[in-house]
Amino acid sequence: MSARPQISFVVPAYNEEVLLPACLNAIRAEVARTGCDAEILVVNNASTDRTAEVAEAIPGVTVVHEPIKGLVSARRCGFEAARGVLIANIDADTKVPPYWLDRVLESFAADPKLVALSGPYDYYDVPLHIRLFSRAFYAMGYLTYAFNKHVLGVGSMVQGGNFIVLRDALAEAGGFSDTFQFYGEDTDIARRMNQVGNVTFTWKLMAQSSGRRLRGDGVVMTGIRYSANYLWATFFRKPFTDAWHDYR
């Protein structure tokens, strides 16, 4: 077997034939620009559309299949298939911008204790007022994260579809937990990763993502749900909300 890639990109995908190509091509552009040794994995998560065929048609992409539908099941499948020293978890409706990969590699090279790195979303397909609201929400979330981490000494923060982990550190932290199936899964990872090394959330690692959940659930309700699940995952180690809707 060849040496481990420097980074594995894992993209869970359930019925994502429309948005998936833009996600994968953005990743491919970053890999090509940097010359980084990387692999790109799409986890076809029980899709009923052409997700698998679309992914297989893109050069350099490997498709693995997870028949049990659910975000955490898909992330775990990708984690088990990935060979990279680092694993970048990118959602199928998300696009990494130019120089995103530089910031990732530089951050891990600069801090030998860094085990997880993440940044916020910039929602590219919603009106300006919703984008501004989301940035204000992230700002409040960041203050809560900083207080919990540096004052109370509990938990940390990552954005589920835009985070990178040191593979061996995630294995040491126990991998992905079945306690969380959607809401709170990223906070749970951040909390456990924080026990084995440094977890950093930075505005310098912003990624572009679809605001389809903001449109579907409403901005206020989305904010309430994510806030409640962040607190429940941090302090009670379980989700506040078990059900979710797939917006496509």
Language-model features: locations:
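Short, flexible, basic/aromatic active-site loop/helix in glycosyltransferases
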Residues: 119-126, 134-156
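Short, well-formed alpha-helical segments that are part of the catalytic scaffolds
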Residues: 16-31
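Acidic helix N-cap motif at the loop->helix transition within catalytic regions
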Residues: 18-21, 48-57
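Short aromatic/hydrophobic "clamp" motif used to bind/position activated sugar donors
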Residues: 87
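Acidic donor-binding loop at a coil-to-helix junction in glycosyltransferase catalytic cores
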Residues: 182-189
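A conserved acidic beta->alpha catalytic loop
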Residues: 26, 44-52, 94
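Conserved donor NDP-sugar-binding/catalytic core segment of glycosyltransferases
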Residues: 99-131
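Glycine-rich, basic loop-to-helix element that forms the pyrophosphate-binding segment
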Residues: 66-82
